[in-house]
């Protein structure tokens, strides 16, 4: 069962492995009991000519049925990369990685940030001073450098990126939650809850946090966009998602040299995709800010 689960995970983030041997050809013809093909060559010269006997094609009982069963014509809307892989397919698989990084990183940052911010804002005093010191130290380190340091410490890999990005984004959440909690805990209903003898955990989780979530939702949308951008940067540097797992940043890394070699679309298309996705989540954050009317 564990092996099947791992296979499903690999298929989701890497794509389904093609077990068939595919040979690109530019021409073919049937000659006697042979299938004669001309292999595709992108250098403007004729490719190698090869003959395949009918005995190799076990699905076809007649050599004339081989083209129908074994030869297919494929179109690549965005072309292929330098390894002959469909760029559109890799882009579609790559968006799964970007969205997964965003969701998991934001989830990790919310868990840590809400917990630390709520504790600091509610208890105050030395507890607040210690937590704010940790927040300020973390805040002073450039985000990308901190992510790179954590990634190098944990090792290259997909899950390491989740943890590294999540551990660098909690400080913003913590500062916002702390400010909200310090304001909300002065409300009369919180004082009433204390008078009724409710414990601190219940007061924080049932009365304070539910009334402090509007700004957190907005910052989460912004953090989602930032996580996608950071992951793309890590993959471009070679310390993010590792091959053969397709990542938009990794696709740019593999093909940025083609910008001056006549095929700039190989790097421009994933770059535009990153820009569009990040912009979309920033617009979502702005819309949430207006809808939730945080300022009022």
Where are these regions (language model features)?
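Membrane-topology segments of multi-pass transport proteins
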Residues: 1-83
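Alpha-helical transmembrane segments of integral membrane proteins
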Residues: 80-296
């Amino acid at each position: 069962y564990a092996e099947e689960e791992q296979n499903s995970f690999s298929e989701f983030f890497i794509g389904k492995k093609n077990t068939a041997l595919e040979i690109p050809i530019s021409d073919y013809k049937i000659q006697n009991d042979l299938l004669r093909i001309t292999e595709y060559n992108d250098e403007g010269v004729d490719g190698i000519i090869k003959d395949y006997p009918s005995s190799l094609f076990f699905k076809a009982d007649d050599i004339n049925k081989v083209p129908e069963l074994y030869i297919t014509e494929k179109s690549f809307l965005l072309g292929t990369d330098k390894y002959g892989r469909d760029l559109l397919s890799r882009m579609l698989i790559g968006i799964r990685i970007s969205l997964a990084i965003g969701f998991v990183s934001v989830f990790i940052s919310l868990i840590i940030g809400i917990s630390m911010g709520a504790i600091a804002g509610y208890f105050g005093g030395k507890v607040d001073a210690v937590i704010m010191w940790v927040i300020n130290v973390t805040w002073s380190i450039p985000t990308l450098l901190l992510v790179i340091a954590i990634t190098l410490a944990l090792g290259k890999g997909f899950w390491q990126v989740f943890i590294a990005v999540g551990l660098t984004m909690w400080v913003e959440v913590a500062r916002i939650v702390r400010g909200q909690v310090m304001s909300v805990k002065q409300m009369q209903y919180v004082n009433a809850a204390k008078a009724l003898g409710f414990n601190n955990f219940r007061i924080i989780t049932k009365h304070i946090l539910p009334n402090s979530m509007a700004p957190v939702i907005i910052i989460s949308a912004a953090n989602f966009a930032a996580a996608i951008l950071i992951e793309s940067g890590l993959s471009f540097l070679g310390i993010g998602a590792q091959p053969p797992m397709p990542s938009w940043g990794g696709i740019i890394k593999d093909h940025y040299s083609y910008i001056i070699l006549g095929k700039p679309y190989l790097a421009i298309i994933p770059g535009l995709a990153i820009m569009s996705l990040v912009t979309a989540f920033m617009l979502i954050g702005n819309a949430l800010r207006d809808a939730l009317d945080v300022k009022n």
